[in-house]
Regions:
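Amphipathic, interaction-prone secondary-structure segments
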Residues: 18-51, 104-136
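Intrinsically disordered, low-complexity regulatory segments enriched in Ser/Thr/Pro
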Residues: 45-88, 128-169
Length: 173
């Protein structure tokens, strides 16, 4: 993975978090992420609403979208995420962040701990399957890791405490 300005050597946690925030905004689900030499390829299902008929019937059509995020796109997503979280009026607390922003962040944390050469993963119904290309002294090899939806949700619940963050008190709460 490319080193982004101001980031540690490998920072899948922050990179994947920013990609996840984009996917949340897009309403994407059942996603696949492949790391490429110059960024990431992301594919998933989106439900697009369309209006048709005399009675304006709302029909949702599922489409499969594919995005190629180059290094510059990733850097921009990260900057936008930092700006959003640093802006007190627009700040999104951890509990308000979308599912993919949270899930990709904790999966990214796991990936950072493994220190792979590159990654591939897919998500379906909240469960993740990862294939990491490792660089042990005996030669490169792929390692598979799986996380159930419940495991990912537990990782999300623990993430705030792990980083020393606490849920911000909401006004009127």
């Amino acid at each position: 993975m490319r080193i982004y300005d101001g980031s540690p050597r490998q920072n899948y946690e922050e990179v994947l978090r920013s990609v996840g925030a984009f996917l949340d905004q897009r309403g994407m689900r059942e996603v696949m992420v492949v790391e490429a030499p110059d960024g990431f390829v992301v594919q998933g299902i989106v439900v697009e609403n369309s209006t048709s008929g005399a009675w304006s019937e709302h029909l949702g059509q599922q489409t499969k979208d594919t995005f190629t995020f180059l290094d510059d796109d990733i850097a921009r997503f990260m900057e936008e995420g930092h700006a959003r979280r640093d802006n007190e009026q627009r700040a999104v607390t951890w509990g308000q962040a979308g599912y993919y922003e949270q899930a990709f962040r904790v999966v990214g944390r796991y990936v950072d701990e493994q220190k792979p050469a590159d990654i591939f993963f897919f998500e379906q119904d909240g469960a993740f399957v990862l294939r990491l290309l490792m660089r042990p002294q005996t030669g490169r090899r792929h390692v598979i890791a799986e996380f159930t939806r419940e495991e990912v949700e537990a990782m999300i619940a623990q993430a705030r405490d792990f980083r020393g963050e606490r849920t911000k008190t909401q006004p009127g709460a």
